[in-house]
Swiss-Prot record:
Region (Disordered) residue spans: 154-183, 276-311
Biased composition (Basic and acidic residues): 301-311
Function: Involved in spliceosome assembly.
Protein name according to UniProt: Splicing factor spf30
Xref: CDD domains: Tudor_SpSPF30-like
GO cellular component: nucleus; spliceosomal complex
SMART domains assigned: TUDOR (SM00333)
Domain topic, free-text comment: The Tudor domain mediates association with dimethylarginines, which are common in snRNP proteins.
Main location: nucleus
Gene3D superfamilies: 2.30.30.140
Family (UniProt): Belongs to the SMN family.
Gene name of the encoded protein: spf30
Biased composition (Polar residues): 168-183
UniProt entry keywords in alphabetical sequence: mRNA processing, mRNA splicing, Nucleus, Phosphoprotein, Spliceosome
Length: 311
C-alpha cells in the first residue's frame, strides 16, 4: 500500500507539471482529480490497517499475560491412587484403574496400572493418565468388592469356564469384558479367574489338552525305484529315434524310385546335374558339371607391343 501511494503521488506531480505548460488540457485535469481521489483513499486504508495492527498487538499482549498468569496444574500420582488410564493395547479409551507402581523420573515417568473392570495390567506414560472424577472415585471406594479385585492375588488353580471363550471375544474392550463377567453364566468363574486374563485362560486350556501325534499309515505305498538300465534307456531314446530315421532314409535312397510300371528303378541322385564323376580326379563346379578335371589351365594374357610393330 505504501509503494502504491508513492507511485500515485509521483504521477500526480508529473501531471501537475504538464498542466503548468498546458493549463487548458481537460484530460490532464481529469487525471489529476482521479489521482487525488486515489491518494486520499489509500491514505485512509493505511490508517485503518495501522489501527487494526495496534489493536491486535495489544490483544495478543493481554492474552500472553493472561496465559502466563495461569500456571499449568501438574498432578503427581502415587501408587494406590485411583485414576482413569487409557487402554493403549486395546481401543485407546480411558477406564477406571489403580496405580500399582511408578518408575522413571520427571517427564519419563512410567505408571503401572491395573484396570478395575478386568484384570489386565499395563504400563503407560503420564499422557495416558488423568485424574478420576470425585463422584466416581467415591463410588468405587465405597464398593469394596471392586477394590478387592485389584488388590488380592489368588494362588488357587484356575478352573475352566462353563462356556468356551472365542478368540473374537478376547479382543473386545474392557467394558464388554466387564458386562460379560457380570452375566449369570460367568459369575461362578469370575470369582476364580479375577486376576487371570482371557489369553492366559486359553493358553492354560490348550496346555491341558492331550497331545495327538499323527498316526503313520499301516501299509505305506512303495517308493518307486529307478534302475540304471531304465535311466540309460531314457537317455538313448532320442539317439535311437534319430538313427531309425536315418536308416529309413538310406533304405529308401538305395531302393530307388520306379519310373514306370515295368521300368528300372533309378537311384535318387543318379541323374542329377550336380553329381560328380566316379573317377578320382572328378569334381563338380559350375563350368564342367561333372566332367573330368583337365590338365591344362588358362594363363594370363600379356600384351606384347613388338608384335604390333612387326605387323
Amino acid at each position: 500500500m505504501e509503494k502504491e501511494l508513492e507511485e500515485y503521488k509521483s504521477q500526480l506531480a508529473l501531471v501537475q507539471i504538464s498542466l503548468q505548460k498546458t493549463p487548458q488540457n481537460e484530460e490532464l485535469q481529469l487525471l489529476e482529480n482521479d489521482l487525488k481521489e486515489l491518494i486520499s483513499l489509500t491514505e485512509n486504508l493505511l490508517q485503518e490497517s495501522v489501527e487494526n495492527d495496534k489493536n491486535t498487538f495489544q490483544n495478543s499482549q493481554n492474552g500472553v499475560a493472561g496465559f502466563n498468569t495461569s500456571k499449568p496444574v501438574h498432578i503427581d500420582f502415587t501408587p494406590g491412587n485411583l485414576v482413569m488410564a487409557r487402554w493403549v493395547s486395546g481401543d485407546y479409551l480411558f477406564y477406571p484403574s489403580r496405580i500399582t507402581a511408578v518408575s522413571g523420573f520427571g517427564a519419563n515417568k512410567k505408571y503401572t496400572v491395573q484396570f478395575l473392570d478386568y484384570p489386565d495390567i499395563e504400563t503407560v506414560s503420564l499422557k495416558h493418565i488423568k485424574a478420576m472424577p470425585e463422584e466416581k472415585r467415591q463410588e468405587i471406594e465405597g464398593n469394596k468388592e471392586i477394590l478387592k479385585k485389584s488388590t488380592t492375588i489368588r494362588s488357587t488353580p484356575v478352573r475352566e469356564p462353563t462356556k468356551a471363550i472365542s478368540v473374537a471375544s478376547m479382543s473386545t474392550s474392557p467394558s464388554n469384558y466387564a458386562s460379560r463377567a457380570s452375566s449369570p453364566d460367568m459369575k461362578s468363574s469370575a470369582a476364580v479367574t479375577a486376576n487371570v486374563s482371557p489369553i492366559q485362560n486359553v493358553a492354560q486350556h490348550v496346555s491341558t489338552l492331550p497331545k495327538i501325534s499323527p498316526i503313520p499309515p499301516s501299509n505305506p505305498p512303495p517308493v518307486p525305484s529307478v534302475s540304471y538300465s531304465q535311466k540309460q534307456q531314457k537317455q538313448l531314446k532320442p539317439k535311437a529315434a534319430l538313427e531309425a530315421s536315418q536308416n529309413s532314409w538310406k533304405q529308401f535312397a538305395a531302393r530307388g524310385v520306379k519310373t514306370g510300371r515295368v521300368g528300372k528303378r533309378k537311384k535318387i541322385g543318379e541323374s542329377s546335374i550336380f553329381k560328380s564323376t566316379e573317377d578320382f580326379p572328378g569334381r563338380t563346379n559350375p563350368k564342367n558339371f561333372g566332367n573330368v578335371a583337365r590338365s591344362g589351365h588358362r594363363e594370363k594374357h600379356i600384351y606384347n607391343y613388338r608384335e604390333d610393330e612387326d605387323s
